[in-house]
């Protein structure tokens, strides 16, 4: 047993998990349950009453958090301690949205001042493009921006830009490219005019394989349309730490925006990686996005655990994964603009907490990161919700919905809300055999048929969910929502005693991918690998099955 599973509180939770009543009973005996098990902060409202939890459950979970020094770990992160112990790095994405007068010292430098300088540089750049003063090589203003990245430098900007579609200023179109599949960039370049297109290349090293390959293809397309190498500086900018490589490529040093080691890719949308967001919604709205996230940072850092929204959500995820064997968690967004959030939270959580050793290198003997998945309501109700209601696996759910729509057309939003709330009720309440049989009482079926169909209509209920509401989707509430999930991810990792801020599995994939590339291009012998890999490489070389 590990140190965590040996703790008395952990073992008490194991025993307690087997004694809980069905949620139907909890609601019937606790008339104040909704009031007692809901909270709000930073423009968000969290109803966590539809969870398999009593007051004793909550007390034990909060005690586990305290026993594992969660509060001191939160302080360590905000203080800039090197909590990423495998890479000896601070974890300070929170500094990217800190106010200008904040002082956070890393390696002798006030990094908040550096962040503010970058924001000022971003403001100048955004103004020059949106005003039309930035001209391409033929003197025309820029109309289209192509953002090239991968992972966090792609998914964050794309999903946030999509979510904040109502706030686009309309001066620019933005296109996102990530996949190294040539089809992706080929399709994006169709219909674009090289004279009015600008590329933003985001790679800390300026050498990420997919990003560099796509950028070189973009450059070849640009030069192939009549531009010259000297024109590259007017149509390519970079977000990178490698100034030398970027300038060698042809990018003006003044048009290179910095990245820092204390920000991981999946936490980087708040930095210059978010440049595409700012180009679409303007810097004022981008700063509102940062302000909303900072407000959640303050809530997380300063609120007692018992009222702390990220702590509550993180504890529930741990509760189901470790004590009910839940292997996945579904995120359901009842707002079309938020349809991409499940994919963003998937990367955030699974890349952070998909770990199997503790900080000191001990193998864990408990489940860590679950599979995160989901989609938008009400589409999912006609697909995978069936599994949520009657499947054999326990799958906790988060429902996310604004109370007010940006597009209040007819009865659409009230129907959306009725479906959202109805799903949470159905998951909690279920339907008993007796209830199903009673519903069939007036049908023309005989008694034997009624009894059979009733068995198929039984739903066990007791399926947990959280509901997160906001008045309206704004840059501020979106910032708070994303920061909520960032900190929820941290809470789990801190209690599991794992490093949520490295990604060695990703690094191994890159390393082996490069080795296979050498063999695919025949610069290395394919027969040195396992027989499966050898066979696949040889099939690729011959080009047919």
Curated annotation (Swiss-Prot):
Biological process according to GO: gluconeogenesis; glucose 6-phosphate metabolic process; glycolytic process
Entry's localization field: Cytoplasm
InterPro entries (UniProt xref): G6P_Isomerase, G6P_Isomerase_C, Phosphoglucose_isomerase_CS, SIS_dom_sf, SIS_PGI_1, SIS_PGI_2
Residues the record marks as active site: 351, 382, 510
Entry annotated with the keyword ATP-binding: no
Pathway assigned to this chain's UniProt record: Carbohydrate biosynthesis; gluconeogenesis; Carbohydrate degradation; glycolysis; D-glyceraldehyde 3-phosphate and glycerone phosphate from D-glucose: step 2/4
Principal subcellular localization: cytoplasm
Top-level taxon of the source organism: Bacteria
Documented EC number(s): 5.3.1.9
The entry's keywords: Cytoplasm, Gluconeogenesis, Glycolysis, Isomerase
Gene3D superfamilies hit by this protein: 1.10.1390.10, Glucose-6-phosphate isomerase like protein, domain 1
Catalytic activity, reaction form: alpha-D-glucose 6-phosphate = beta-D-fructose 6-phosphate
Manganese is among the record's keywords: no
GO cellular component: cytosol
Gene Ontology molecular function: carbohydrate derivative binding; glucose-6-phosphate isomerase activity; monosaccharide binding
Function of the molecule: Catalyzes the reversible isomerization of glucose-6-phosphate to fructose-6-phosphate.
Family: Belongs to the GPI family.
Protein name per the record: Glucose-6-phosphate isomerase
Gene that this sequence comes from: pgi
